[in-house]
Structures are given as structure tokens and as C-alpha cells.
UniProtKB/Swiss-Prot annotation:
InterPro entries: P-loop_NTPase, RapZ-like, RapZ-like_N, RapZ_C. Keywords: ATP-binding, GTP-binding, Nucleotide-binding. GTP binds at residues 63-66. This is Nucleotide-binding protein spyM18_0713. Gene3D superfamilies: P-loop containing nucleotide triphosphate hydrolases. It comes from Streptococcus pyogenes serotype M18 (strain MGAS8232). Belongs to the RapZ-like family. SUPFAM superfamilies: P-loop containing nucleoside triphosphate hydrolases.
Amino acid sequence: MSDKHINLVIVTGMSGAGKTVAIQSFEDLGYFTIDNMPPALVPKFLELIEQTNENRRVALVVDMRSRLFFKEINSTLDSIESNPSIDFWILFLDATDGELVSRYKETRRSHPLAADGRVLDGIRLERELLSPLKSMSQHVVDTTKLTPRQLRKTISDQFSEGSNQASFRIEVMSFGFKYGLPLDADLVFDVRFLPNPYYQVELREKTGLDEDVFNYVMSHPESEVFYKHLLNLIVPILPAYQKEGKSVLTVAIGCTGGQHRSVAFAHCLAESLATDWSVNESHRDQNRRKETVNRS
């Protein structure tokens, strides 16, 4: 990107999904940040940035706290998109209704759209109203299972200096179905049909990243056949996703607990795709069982 360009990230999403942590993360990365920016003021603010030699990496939180949000957001985005000197991305933070309710109960704050005080009603209305904006977003992050530290790392991985947000990147992740589907997944594959290392006593406490577990999972004939078909399905469609302008494609592979089979498969897939593509590998639930045991 040209140094004359403004690199703008608009941070939005569900109330309670982590926008405060997100904007603090951008500040730590060296972005000029503003929280609770009225949409109508964004174009004028960007004009001022263009006229200076100040930091041209900008992150703005634009959300439901602005009373005129829905009247102004579309015209604001049109104005930004028509400016050739601005490269911009929308980061949409989401979480399940149950998790958002839990967070509101913990903080004892009211939801901006809960006129009668019913948090869940406010969340459902907000989700409905934000649905079009979410569909426009280049980056959707589900924070349901993320700690603040994990969210900071996610943002750092995607937006730190030197990363190319405009490039196409593949996120390969493993997860456990018992802990819920990842909301930000584009493609989901189920490997629960494979033999489960959990029932091998010597493998139970290990993960799919351990060599003996990995070999156990991948050596079965069913694994070899499925993995071959998985590659044959995914690899040919990657250029099409890139051509359509998608910046991040999230491929999620799940097993029961997210500790053995899905971890091994996700690791294998990430290594295969990394020969030709930019790939990040993550394992959402691989240590969750151990954490549960330790807390009990």
C-alpha cells in the first residue's frame, strides 16, 4: 500500500462483544483510535487526517451508542468507499446471545436497545438491525470463547504492522462440538466418525499435536480417504474466494471435545495449505478438558 493511503479499520458489532478490548488493542499496535465515533463525523475526520502527516493507520469504533447510527452508517460507508486514498476494513465482533447476557449480568450495565430493561430483547433487536452490516464485514470474530488476551492476539495477528489485510488468508481451526460451533467459521467439517484416541488410555491426556496421537488419527484408512477428499474440495475453491474479495476464510474442523481428532486434522490441513497460501492455525478447545478437570 502507498504511504499516502489511510488504512482505516471500522470496529463494530454486538454490544458487549469486546469492542473496548479491540480498540485498546489497536492503540497498542500504533493505530490512531477513537471510541464511539458518530458515523456522520467519520468522513470529515478522515479529511483532516489526509491533510496532515500524522499517523495514517486509524481504528474507529462505530456502534449502537450513536443514536443516528442506522441513518448515517450507509452514507458514511459509501463516502469512504468512494475515496481512492482510503483502504478500509470492517471488523465485526460477535458472541452468542447467552454469552452476551452473561457479560451484561456480570457488569450490571444496561443494553443500549433494551428500553424496558430486558437485556435479551435488546440483544435480539441489535442482532437483527446489525445483520446487514455484519454481512458486509471483511473480518468477523466470534468472541464467545475468547479471553481478552486471546482477542488481543487475534487482532494483532490480523492488523499488526507488516500484515497485509488486503491479502487472502486462511484460518484453519479445530474445535469441539460439545462446546459449540465457531460462529465465524465459513467451512465446517466433522471428523467425529473417526476412531477416538480418547479411548486409548495412553493417549487420553494428550492432544492431536502430540506425535503419537497425530499418527494414531491420521493412519486410519478412513482418515486417509477423508483427508484426500478434503483437500480436493478445499484447494480448488480457494482462488474463487480470493477473487470475490474475501480477506479471511475460516475452515473449522470439529470432533467431540476438540482435543484429538480435530486437532490432528486441522494441523495436517494447515501444513498442506501453507505451501501455497498464508495460513494461521489455531486450536480453540484442545486444553479445555484439562482446564475443566483442574477447576473441579
